[in-house]
């Protein structure tokens, strides 16, 4: 849903509730339970309950309301958000060295997201299914199988798209938040003393009383704000104002009421710590609440899956991941996509995590490191944008950065304590993704530079061919060209082996702009290089899919008539060999070869009919 959509504000706000707030909205299922479960050396004590509630409330205010909704969401690229967008914006007005550092930060943040998405569906669905322990304790052995069944169904429907099912997301999540509020308010009315925890003094007293342990306990408190990056990442779908409106009118009040309601329950009944969320409900409401919780966590998982599809497409289009098959599941909404490879790889990883960790409490130990790491990087990148792009006063920006890091760094440091008990998982997955992205980008650059160095000058070659033309054959030939100033290898090899040229030769370059969309007026640029040579440059945004047939249509409007089924497409297929390098660079080269062999072929990327494609091979040493 783009920001220029003509839907009414209430409908867009409702849709935002259904998609954006799924992850953070299901955090009450497990957050307070993990805070007070006894793992930090203290149980359900009054000061501890007040301290944790105060910390949760002020984190929701400072991190979500102030940092993300007020500050970070100001940084948009044509309305789009996300960590890679922030990386792109931050690097626009900086030196080459600074830009490289910012790119690394952005890629680390994106990699952290990949590490976290494996945990989110598992912990969300398992925490909901664990309500069975309250309803029927004898069914606790079914928690893992049922969680896998629910997620299997979710991943299976991805290829069909979520357009129809997605219409139910908003009313279900709105119902979820209203139930959160009602359950919490009911408990608060019975014990209003808990509202004293709104005073930040209780958070300060918590640190003073529990000292070192209180710092480590921040690793559990951060569970209340997991999913905060989704607010920024989904900005392009719904717009800033609907997301902010949904937070302040529905989501924030519901979360606060439920957390404080759980706290009020625990003050009266400390034994409810085994599952304070479900024990808020009366006995007759447990089964309906269990079903609603399962639906809410499935929706939260769907939002994460859609997010990883979007991030992958953006990384592919920006050249950080190898091309892969991307299927559009909706003719109306460009954001609804399905990536089979990513879908089933993620499913396999989630199932392995569920089977390995067995309980959401065990998974909570793995949750948080990647989230807080991304928060630190977002603070640095967003304040860089404020200074370099918005030209804010450097001292004011420095104060903002210090304020953000004073919260982010302690949260990240506290989560490092989880490293051995599960935190290694998202970090390991993130490291793998970072290695893959940097390998593809750097080795691809090395390959293109190598081909450019050994290529022939375009202008000189065309002048030579026009002066001493080879045999011409009827028709149009399109040569896919990566570099504007160099003759494509496929053209050189065609001349070398076939010794002919077509009557019309088009050098076609498809490039990705640093923007989500490119206006149709700027889509195609045509330049006639000689009586028989044309250069066509087609520009696309990173949210768009290149389509050669569309390019031909645009060319026809500009006076260069082309017919797909009467055109031959010549492409070079590089056979790569790794040259002499240090051992670690050889390993990176081998990884690149593996990625390239499994990458989507160019004809499939650009939707070119296979029977119109001629591939000419060339060997390149990298």
UniProtKB/Swiss-Prot annotation:
UniProt subcellular location: Cell inner membrane
GO molecular function: potassium ion transmembrane transporter activity; symporter activity
Catalytic activity as recorded in UniProt: K(+)(in) + H(+)(in) = K(+)(out) + H(+)(out)
GO cellular component term of the entry, any: plasma membrane
Top-level taxon of the source organism: Bacteria
This protein's UniProt keywords: Cell inner membrane, Cell membrane, Ion transport, Membrane, Potassium, Potassium transport, Symport, Transmembrane, Transmembrane helix, Transport
Chief subcellular location: membrane
UniProt xrefs under HAMAP family: Kup
Protein name per Swiss-Prot or TrEMBL: Low affinity potassium transport system protein Kup
Annotated organism of origin: Salmonella gallinarum (strain 287/91 / NCTC 13346)
Lineage, top ranks: Bacteria, Pseudomonadati, Pseudomonadota, Gammaproteobacteria, Enterobacterales
